[in-house]
A protein has these predicted regions:
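Short, ordered beta-strand-loop transition motifs
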Residues: 67-68, 87, 144-149
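Non-cytosolic head/periplasmic domains of membrane-anchored proteins
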Residues: 93-171
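Short, non-transmembrane alpha-helical segments in secretory-pathway proteins
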Residues: 31-64, 104-117, 171
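Intrinsically disordered, low-complexity regulatory segments enriched in Ser/Thr/Pro
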Residues: 83-95, 188-190
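N-terminal non-globular leader segments, chiefly Sec-dependent signal peptides
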Residues: 10, 23-36, 145
Length: 242
């Protein structure tokens, strides 16, 4: 072996010793995580990362994954994004657009509800996930339009009005929405004044118990421009004890 070859061999061996020593120190300082933790971490990221990437690409950098794997909006701090995987399109669909248009949708729908119920509170949230071709430029009126995948918009209407006229109220609401060509899932709850006043505009579903013991009557229906369907039997109304 030449002197140059011996020199290279010495350098290689020294480097190998240094790398092994460094690796030993690293293992001592940072021992490998238990296998079950590595598996849990892999499953967490394999479940949440594709959803985050989809949402960020579509709407912008305003989402985070929680420790439980849910996707939360940083713009609407109390909102968790609901997504579904479409096998046909090989992509996700979501309800986030409804929240982006929440204020505009409520500005359209609240005046209609007030003409029928008088004093009332109306909140908008998503129902069906929107088609993949809907984007952040989709308008409120497009969300209210008829679609095979819809309805996309769901509303909760709370009112302290006397429920004796509930059938007439629902008929008027149906006619008003049908006249505009809206496709909506509508929930109506007649409450006592005390319960009604406790309903908060934000995060009301978590802050107020509006179960059977809190409402007087509760009805749900899907209203389309040319059809009406009760979601709770033929009569459609559930009587509470509130």
């Amino acid at each position: 072996m030449t002197k140059r070859g011996k020199g290279r061999l010495v350098i290689f061996l020294c480097a190998a010793v240094i790398l092994v020593a460094a690796g030993s120190v690293r293992v001592k300082l940072h021992p490998p995580r238990p296998l079950h933790e590595q598996i849990a971490d892999y499953m967490y990221h394999s479940r949440t990362d594709p959803k985050l990437e989809y949402l960020i690409e579509k709407y912008g950098d305003e989402f985070v994954a929680t420790e439980y794997g849910s996707i939360q909006s940083t713009r609407f701090s109390d909102f968790y994004v609901y997504l579904e995987w479409s096998e046909a399109e090989q992509t996700y669909t979501d309800t986030y657009l409804v929240y982006l248009r929440k204020e505009e949708l409520e500005s359209i729908l609240v005046p209609i509800a007030e003409t029928i119920f008088g004093e009332c509170k109306l909140f908008v949230y998503g129902y069906s996930t929107c088609p993949s071709n809907f984007g952040k430029d989709t308008t409120a009126l497009e969300l209210l339009s008829v679609s095979e995948e819809g309805p996309f918009v769901q509303i909760d209407i709370f009112t302290p009005k006397d429920p004796k006229q509930r059938n007439e109220d629902m008929q008027k609401l149906t006619e008003a929405f049908q006249e505009q060509g809206y496709f909506i899932y509508a929930n109506i709850k007649y409450l006592s004044s005390e319960t009604y006043n406790a309903v908060e505009e934000t995060d009301y579903r978590h802050g107020v118990n509006i179960g059977r013991d809190a409402y007087k009557y509760f009805g749900s229906a899907i209203i389309a421009p040319d059809s009406f369907e009760w979601m709770r039997g033929d009569d459609g109304w559930c009587e509470g004890t509130g």
